[in-house]
């Protein structure tokens, strides 16, 4: 499913330099590889898990290292996962933080969504919902919790959803 999803991205990452902070966790091997397969030049940081250093001053809860690396390397984008890789935040080339709602909006703009539906929760940002609707996408709200979003996505074959707090 993970690599199948790469085919839904309208634009490849060719010529884009991406710093990815893997939080010394589950994303340490997968995230850099997915980005490389998508064509990105990848700089991986905090990608050496040893069983004790997960989330240690790195990842989506500690963005300082990512922001610094993006700025010093001239990267176009930075991505930060948490230790279990169920959360991602981004920073732009200047180090400005891009939160989960913005990421979902960007993905909706650049992804073929077969069901034309995005799943979120009753707490999803109203601005995001209005933005999706202006693009003729349907927004479906579930109760708060990744379980409910995932259940809705699986039951109705939706490809894009988020529960907030950068869980996309």
Located regions from the model:
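Phosphate-binding chemistry for phosphorylated carbohydrates and sugar-nucleotides
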Residues: 3-165
């Amino acid at each position: 499913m993970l690599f199948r999803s790469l085919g839904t991205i309208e634009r490849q990452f060719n010529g884009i330099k991406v710093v990815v902070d893997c939080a010394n966790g589950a994303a340490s091997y997968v995230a850099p590889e997915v980005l490389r397969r998508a064509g990105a030049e990848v700089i991986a940081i905090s990608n050496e898990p040893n069983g004790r250093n997960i989330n240690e001053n790195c990842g989506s809860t500690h963005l300082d290292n990512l922001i610094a690396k993006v700025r010093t390397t001239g990267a176009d984008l930075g991505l930060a996962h948490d230790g279990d890789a169920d959360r991602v935040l981004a920073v732009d080339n200047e180090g400005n933080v891009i939160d989960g709602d913005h990421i979902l909006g960007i993905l909706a703009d650049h992804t073929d969504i077969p069901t034309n539906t995005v799943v979120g929760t009753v707490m999803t940002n109203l601005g995001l919902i209005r933005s999706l609707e202006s693009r003729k996408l349907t927004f479906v709200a579930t109760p708060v919790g990744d379980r409910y979003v995932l259940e809705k996505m699986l039951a109705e074959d939706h490809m894009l959803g988020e529960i907030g707090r950068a869980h996309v």
